[in-house]
Amino acid sequence: MENLEGIVDRAKDAVAKAESEQSLEQLRVDYLGKKGRITQLLKELGRLDAAERPAAGAKINEAKLLVQDLINEAKSELSSKNEAAKLAAESIDVTLPGRKESLGTLHPVTRTMLRIEDFFARSGYTVEEGPEIQDDYHNFEALNIPSHHPARAMHDTFYFDPKTLLRTHTSPVQIRVMESSKPPFRMICPGRVYRCDSDMTHTPMFHQVEGLMVDKHVSFADLKSTIVEFLREFFEKDLEVRFRPSYFPFTEPSAEVDIEWGRNEDGSIKWLEVMGCGMVHPKVFEAAGVDSETYSGFAFGMGVERLAMLRYGVNDLRMFFENDMRFLDQF
């Protein structure tokens, strides 16, 4: 039988030199495992005389407990050292200045919406809102958009059923206000609108601001001066603004509004379309219960994302909706 004291002494030295819990676990296996050195001594007891076995077995068990205690104690010390080192590494220097919380900022579309609202609020316009789910009448019929108009097609409009849909513009808000109130009116109607379209410059949901002014003796000159003043203040430039004849079923006459956006190679102005407008069609007044013989008015509409793209130099409309903090942190 191998010398028990020698085995215990070697175990003590090995435990003292161990630098990790993994090393200690390996020592436990080497000395106390199924094939460990001390365990093997117990298996060799059968070779001894019957009279010697009890005393030898007691010594081996005592040695086994001693080595186990040494290993457990060493594990405890290592664990304490590791915990102390971890706490030291994670300690907080309370003398350092505190870190400020990361604050969010307004989304560029929200900034643009507020900028538009601010201008018209200072011009005496109220901000009106209405439901995004509309009936066919307020979204189309009351705005002089007949049943055969292309805007009613399934590929352009989200329908719930033949008479209920997601609004394609905020004009229904104007109709509802005119139905429930008496002129004069000055209002803008900001909000989300929905159309079946998706590419670099279109999304199925986008934001729109439509405006309406109704009073006695309102003329196209009033419309023009309002739009020109708004665009020059919005872009903070003395822009050239062009009104180009167009067609909208709810206004007559109607116009597309273009702004100066650089120069062509020959030095001529490069025009960029930004919004639509016109004088309110008499049939719209009739549907809303307003006397078109007494009152006249103008209306205009603009896409908020489009204006935001132009103001902030964004080329892809979809970036506004991807919630990429690398993009949003720039505003």
Curated annotation (Swiss-Prot):
Mg(2+) binds at E252. One of its GO terms (cellular component) is cytoplasm. It holds the Pfam family Phe_tRNA-synt_N. GO terms for molecular function: ATP binding; magnesium ion binding; phenylalanine-tRNA ligase activity; tRNA binding. The keyword Metal-binding applies. Its EC number is 6.1.1.20. Its cofactor is Mg(2+). It comes from the Bacteria. One of its GO terms (biological process) is phenylalanyl-tRNA aminoacylation. Binds 2 magnesium ions per tetramer. It is found in: Cytoplasm. The keyword Lipid metabolism does not apply. Keywords: Aminoacyl-tRNA synthetase, ATP-binding, Cytoplasm, Ligase, Magnesium, Metal-binding, Nucleotide-binding, Protein biosynthesis. Coiled coil: none annotated. It catalyses: tRNA(Phe) + L-phenylalanine + ATP = L-phenylalanyl-tRNA(Phe) + AMP + diphosphate + H(+). PANTHER family: PHENYLALANINE--TRNA LIGASE, MITOCHONDRIAL, PHENYLALANYL-TRNA SYNTHETASE. Tetramer of two alpha and two beta subunits. Belongs to the class-II aminoacyl-tRNA synthetase family. Phe-tRNA synthetase alpha subunit type 1 subfamily. This is Phenylalanine--tRNA ligase alpha subunit. It comes from Hahella chejuensis (strain KCTC 2396).
